[in-house]
Design a protein with these regions (language model features):
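Short glycine-centered, acidic/aromatic-flanked micro-motifs in structured strand/loop junctions
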Residues: 36-38, 90-92, 216
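Alpha-helical scaffold elements lining the catalytic groove of polysaccharide deacetylases
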Residues: 188-200
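Active-site-proximal helices and loops of the catalytic beta/alpha 8
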Residues: 13-32, 47-53, 57, 64-85, ...
């Protein structure tokens, strides 16, 4: 009997870990993760306090925070140098450990959680710029990648898989045990690799993070990851987490369909998984290469993960540079096409599927270009313009009115079902979220949308949160009147600045 009790307790503990790794630990009234790509810790802390917390954002994906090799590429250092680690010390162009802790305290205090992009699949391949094969990290640590010598961890040759290149993406063993883009491939079955990885992640938990984005999860064996994740501490209650909370996991698994040797489903027991096909399907529709009407059934029937397991996004830092898009870059929407991008993001925020993450980018002319920097390679802080947008080379999609207000829509209507689906032709659609919210889209070339549709909302005059917002009892954009029976006349001109309107119960005037 005693052995049965022990087994039951073990199974219950394992189930709690798995369930916990799907929970992002948002504050009530908050949702959505924003990737503040390449931001400094001091700027992130300020953005939490002045914008993200008050506006109801749930959390932030941080760029890698541990030490990486310095790569000098002309006048600009590439963004991808962060993905070439030389140690697990918390030091980067974003700041040091004290800067990180200050950011963590300030963001958690206003209800914004932090998720660190972690690299435990590999170490740096770039030999640095000295010509002697010795790479120098941003914190001064040195490494000799060609010899697999990383003394600041420490890692040596015995901690890596035998050197081989991925030449056959249809071979799952090769994809997991050989070198991704020549990066020395750590062997997560080795005790030292597991110990150092666990120590690194536990230290970040001590510093107040809510979870992790696991880079290159596809290139690691799920069984090894399960061992590492199972050894992590519970989240620290001093940062506002409930006792017993487990770290949220976002695992990067690029799965572009059944032809893949490694499938996303192999990782769902460990947490959420990046759903790249969601990005493709939504982008293809709003680019105009597919009809909006088909999006009504977007989900598992399309080959997507179940909603609980899916981390969904319109774009991410890779596929906006045509990396990991499976040759479908033309169907990936980014800030460079603002009108359809805002429409696609509004759809993703309103459609009740998956855990949503949005991008906050910097402008770039080529795919290697790093963040805005000064003559000494210091990252330049975003400036905030009078209209709330960003300057100094930063896009800040999360501050675009249409996107910010749709995150609020998502928060207000959290947990309500999709109702009252409407379509006219191929590319005019609308749907409600119970008696809470309503959105409509017109992506029909050369045609206006003028329809009387059922919103599901109580009677009243509502402020369209796409064209403006409610200020007191007034609306800075256009207003929409809902009749006693829930119907409303919806008008979206073919050449409207935004091809979408949205109203919700809190935008009633």
């Amino acid at each position: 009997m005693k052995s049965k009790v022990v087994l039951l307790l073990t199974l219950l503990a394992a189930a709690a870990v798995v369930h916990g790794q799907h929970d992002p630990h948002f504050w009530p009234g908050h949702s959505t993760i924003v990737h503040l790509f390449e931001w400094k810790f001091s700027d992130i802390a300020l953005e939490c306090e002045r914008f993200l917390g008050p506006r109801g954002f749930g959390g932030i994906q941080l760029s890698p925070v541990n030490e990486y090799v310095i790569v000098q590429r002309g006048a600009n250092r590439p963004w991808w140098e962060r993905y070439q680690p030389v140690s697990f010390k918390i030091i980067s162009r974003s700041g040091n450990e004290q800067d990180f802790l200050d950011m963590s305290r300030r963001c958690n205090a206003v209800g914004v959680r932090l998720y660190v992009d972690i690299i435990i699949n590999h170490m740096a391949a770039h030999p640095g710029d000295s010509g002697d094969g010795v790479g120098v990290g941003v914190g001064g640590s040195t490494a000799i990648p060609r010899d697999r010598y990383f003394p600041a961890v420490p890692f040596g040759d015995a901690d890596f898989n035998p050197s081989c290149q991925i030449t056959d993406w249809g071979n799952a063993v090769q994809v997991r045990d050989c070198e991704l883009l020549g990066l020395p491939d750590l062997n997560q079955a080795v005790g030292n690799v597991r110990d150092r990885s666990v120590d690194f992640l536990n230290h970040l938990i001590d510093l107040g993070v809510a979870g992790f984005r696991v880079d290159a999860a596809k290139h690691m064996w799920p069984g090894d990851m399960e061992v590492i994740f199972g050894r992590l501490k519970n989240l620290d209650p001093s940062f506002g987490f409930a006792p017993g909370s487990r770290a949220f996991m976002m695992q990067e698994v690029i799965d572009n369909g059944p032809h893949e040797a490694i499938r996303k489903y192999e990782y769902t027991h460990l947490g959420t998984v990046t759903e790249f096909m969601y990005s493709f399907y939504v982008g293809r529709a709003f680019v105009g290469n597919d009809a909006l009407i088909w999006l009504q059934t977007l989900g598992v029937d399309w080959g997507l993960l179940p909603s609980r397991d899916a981390l969904v996004f319109v774009d991410n830092h890779d596929n906006q540079r045509d990396h990991g898009s499976g040759g479908q870059g033309g169907n990936i929407l980014t800030h460079k096409a603002p009108r359809p991008y805002k429409m696609a993001t509004a759809f993703a925020a309103a459609f009740p599927f998956g855990q949503l993450r949005i991008m906050s980018s910097f402008f770039f002319d080529d795919s290697d270009q790093g963040p805005p920097e000064d003559a000494n390679n210091n990252i330049i802080s975003p400036s905030i313009n009078p209209d709330g947008s960003c300057g100094n080379g930063w896009v800040c999609e999360h501050r675009w009115r249409q996107i910010t207000n749709m995150i609020n829509f998502r928060n207000v209507c959290w947990g309500t079902p999709m109702t009252n689906w409407f379509s006219s032709g191929q590319n005019k659609i609308a749907f409600g979220r119970g008696s809470c919210g309503f959105v409509a889209f017109n992506n029909e070339p050369g045609q206006d949308m003028l329809e009387v549709v059922q919103t599901g909302l109580p009677a009243g005059v509502y402020c369209d949160v796409i064209s403006g917002e409610k200020v007191g009892s007034a609306c800075t954009g256009k207003s929409i009147s809902v009749l006693a029976d829930g119907r409303a006349s919806i008008s979206i001109a073919r050449d409207a600045e935004d091809g979408v309107v949205a109203i919700h119960i809190e935008s009633r005037l």
